[in-house]
Amino acid sequence: LCDRRQRQMCIRDRIRHCAFIRGSAIIGKGSVVGNSTEIKNDIIFNTVQVPHYNYVGDSILGYKSHMGAGSITSNVKSDKTLVVVKDSRDSGEEIETGLKKFGAMLGDHVEVGCNSVLNPGTVICPNCNVYPLSSVRGVIPANHIYKDADHIVAKKEK
């Protein structure tokens, strides 16, 4: 499944039945790419789980992040314009990527709920959770729970 001519590198990972890897993909040690999952032009750190029915394109998934069943990273805007990373917090800062294809960046230990869509240019900082069926955009600060666009709450300390 990993072809050097395609600039792919897979190190001690688990590529399951019917997974599809294309473009330049780096998949870290102990990661799982599951059934009916497509990986395209990604950097996937160690022990990441993309276990079933996912699409991850032009994205970076941090250490021990997990994409729930059916969750995807959308990597192209519907109007085909260049992707801009927009900070959804008070600053409203915008970073122009200069790219038409730019998916999402997930920090370490991010959990994405089933059937969620991470829109182009989404950044989810470390230790965050995304509720199932969410449509996420912008920057989600570290240690937060994304319930919906109007309800992004800090995690309670244990």
What are these regions, as identified by a protein language model?
Residues 8, 16-19, 24-26:
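Right-handed parallel beta-helix
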Residues 35-158:
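Glycine-rich hexapeptide-repeat left-handed beta-helix
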Residues 28-34:
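Surface-exposed extracellular loop regions of Gram-negative outer-membrane beta-barrel proteins
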